[in-house]
Amino acid sequence: MSAVDEQNQPNLNYFNTMPSWQHYVSRTPKEFYDWYNGVSEEVAEFEVAELIRLSGDRKVIVDTNIPLDTLYKIAEPNHVAVMLSPQSMSVASFFNRGDPEKQFLLKEIEKCSNPEAAFENFKACIASVNNPEVYEAYLHSGFFTLIRENTERDTREEVFQKLAEHFELN
């Protein structure tokens, strides 16, 4: 039995009900934005429970999309790090990473009847969830924030070092 059901978590259940992957990559930016934020809200309760379970008597570091309003309720500012990059960077570099999920989506886009239009549309979808209002909300959230503006200059090692200092892991 799954803890996710269509009635209580329609956004998390989307992948069980979507017509096709081409439909997924062809939604409007507004539909994608609403779905993405719905998923963040719906999954937060599961993520918080898992964080409590994992943390026990140790520190854990996770990459999550827990919404700010939830983070304010459950975490001290020094227990959160927000990582931001400009919208242009997040959109331009989305498919440049080699992770299998991104490459899978790229292949699904190529299967669309008009792959170029589908690609541009999906980039607009990514831009919608990385819009300036969202960026500003995270930037001014009161949480520790790292801004990555240059993939060549801002190395992983530097980012890890800044995070280690923030979380007092050194």
Regions found by a protein language model. Give the residues of each.
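Conserved catalytic network of the ASCE P-loop NTPase/AAA+ motor domain
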Residues: 52-55, 73-77
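ATP-dependent small-molecule kinase phosphotransfer cores
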Residues: 2-59, 66
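Conserved nucleotide-binding/hydrolysis micro-motifs of P-loop NTPases
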Residues: 66-68, 85-91, 152-153
